[in-house]
UniProtKB/Swiss-Prot annotation:
The keyword Cell cycle does not apply. It comes from the Eukaryota. CDD domains: RNase_HI_eukaryote_like (cd09280). Monomer. Its EC number is 3.1.26.4. Binds 1 Mg(2+) ion per subunit. May bind a second metal ion at a regulatory site, or after substrate binding. It comes from Homo sapiens. GO terms for molecular function: magnesium ion binding; nucleic acid binding; RNA binding; RNA nuclease activity; RNA-DNA hybrid ribonuclease activity. PANTHER family: RIBONUCLEASE H1 (PTHR10642:SF26). This is Ribonuclease H1. Coiled coil: none annotated. Residues 136-282 form the RNase H type-1 domain. GO terms for cellular component: mitochondrial matrix; mitochondrion.
Length: 286
């Protein structure tokens, strides 16, 4: 009887796919930098380690040996780094719930045209290695934030921050031109990130922001405002019309996943974007 059990066990093992070779039913997901490092068998397990983790590094491999080699920093250079291919699970969806439009559009700012103050970026940015970006699936991850001291009071100072990862050459904190308000800063931080992405030929972007006003404005309210002649449901002029016009124009040709992250809640990317924005607010206006 013991011999039969041994034989049955050997047969069962032979029927299993070899984990050190090519798996017939999936791939191996290697995480070099994330919450936990190692090799995982599903994209969901991998994503749990790299989602919202700054400068995460991960790859998908056909064999376990290659996956572990990557974890040990000796992976084959032929495999592209940092993203899931078209057969993998899709990255996070856009904000699942769209809030209702506020009755007054934006109650914290006074209406004033802004377009004349804002200058589009015209300086071409040097190409940056794709390995320096963080990825969620095949989407590049970026964090944006805006700030304004004395918002709505005398002598406000606003800045925008864009954070791509630790020490990334595209990280930027600059003073917001024109009308100094917090919500304008939030919108134009997103504008800056998209401008930068386009200079790097990046057309898939996961953009994290703590501004639900920006997210709901660009994903939902803008269409209603346009149909209503850029007026709110209460019949008032949309205060940030020119800002959202600029943002919507930049999103053309881009696949952007708008993601909300709670502000000042310990998310490193958000904290760094906030730091950059505050540094930008200290700069003088050009």
């Amino acid at each position: 009887m013991s011999w039969l059990l041994f034989l049955a066990h050997r047969v069962a093992l032979a029927a299993l796919p070899c984990r050190r070779g090519s798996r017939g039913f999936g791939m191996f997901y290697a995480v070099r930098r994330g919450r936990k490092t190692g090799v995982f068998l599903t994209w969901n397990e991998c994503r749990a380690q790299v989602d919202r983790f700054p400068a995460a590094r991960f790859k998908k491999f056909a064999t376990e040996d290659e996956a572990w080699a990557f974890v040990r920093k000796s992976a084959s250079p032929e495999v592209s780094e940092g993203h899931e291919n078209q057969h993998g699970q899709e990255s996070e969806a856009k904000a699942s719930k769209r809030l209702r439009e506020p009755l007054d559009g934006d109650g914290h700012e006074s209406a004033e045209p802004y377009a004349k103050h804002m200058k589009p970026s015209v300086e071409p940015a040097p190409p940056v290695s794709r390995d320096t970006f963080s990825y969620m699936g095949d989407f590049v991850v970026v964090y944006t934030d805006g700030c304004c001291s004395s918002n709505g009071r005398r002598r406000p100072r606003a800045g925008i921050g864009v954070y791509w990862g630790p020490g990334h050459p595209l990280n930027v904190g600059i003073r917001l031109p024109g009308r100094q308000t917090n919500q304008r800063a939030e919108i134009h931080a997103a504008c800056k990130a998209i401008e930068q992405a386009k200079t790097q030929n990046i057309n898939k972007l996961v953009l994290y922001t703590d501004s639900m006003f920006t997210i709901n404005g660009i994903t939902n309210w803008v269409q209603g405002w346009k149909k209503n002649g850029w007026k709110t449901s209460a019949g008032k002029e949309v205060i940030n019309k020119e800002d959202f016009v600029a943002l919507e124009r930049l999103t053309q040709g881009m696949d952007i996943q708008w993601m909300h992250v709670p502000g000042h809640s310990g998310f490193i990317g958000n904290e760094e974007a906030d730091r950059l924005a505050r540094e930008g607010a200290k700069q003088s206006e050009d």
